[in-house]
Amino acid sequence: MPPKARAGAAVKKVRRKERKNVAHGQAHIKSTFNNTIVSITDPTGAVISWASAGQVGFKGSRKSTPFAAQLAAEAAARRAMEHGMRKVDVFVKGPGSGRETAIRSLQAVGLEVGQISDVTPQPHNGCRPPKRRRV
């Protein structure tokens, strides 16, 4: 005899992953001094897949390396290609070391890279920058 559900017990809803069929999209690469985050979106800006150097498995100062950015871009691109992504326009933001490496790895995985734009925000004399490092 199967066990009966208790009265008032919460029923867990399982959310199934839906497969979006998007052939063309955008790759947003945010490369800071400490990490690199790659988000792949559809043309309207809704995120399809993302990956970061920390999510791929790097910790501490190794997150800021070009190799970590390469693995993060590959992981995000593979996940986006499962949803049918074939071509991306790349938007790069930030001064980090993983900018070019991430773009190259998007191409190496098999995504066709269209235009590449640098959308790094430039202050019009806004916030005071961090003090100079004394090493």
UniProtKB/Swiss-Prot annotation:
Disulfide bridge partners, by residue number: none
For this chain's UniProt record, which GO biological process terms are given?
translation
InterPro entries membership: Ribosomal_uS11, Ribosomal_uS11_bac-type, Ribosomal_uS11_CS, Ribosomal_uS11_sf
The UniProt entry, under Gene3D superfamilies, shows: Ribosomal protein S11 (3.30.420.80)
Region Disordered: start-end pairs: 1-22
Q: Name one GO cellular component term.
A: ribonucleoprotein complex
* Record key words, sorted: Ribonucleoprotein, Ribosomal protein, RNA-binding, rRNA-binding
* MF-aspect GO terms: rRNA binding; structural constituent of ribosome
SUPFAM superfamilies named among the record's database cross-references: Translational machinery components
Superkingdom, according to UniProt?
Bacteria
Regions of compositional bias (Low complexity) in chain numbering: 1-11
Q: Which family does it belong to?
A: Belongs to the universal ribosomal protein uS11 family.
Output the PANTHER family linked to this UniProt entry. 40S RIBOSOMAL PROTEIN S14/30S RIBOSOMAL PROTEIN S11
The protein's job, in short, is:
Located on the platform of the 30S subunit, it bridges several disparate RNA helices of the 16S rRNA. Forms part of the Shine-Dalgarno cleft in the 70S ribosome.
Assembly and interaction partners = Part of the 30S ribosomal subunit. Interacts with proteins S7 and S18. Binds to IF-3.
The name of this protein is Small ribosomal subunit protein uS11
Q: Which organism is it from?
A: Salinispora arenicola (strain CNS-205)
Q: What is the lineage of its organism?
A: Bacteria, Bacillati, Actinomycetota, Actinomycetes, Micromonosporales
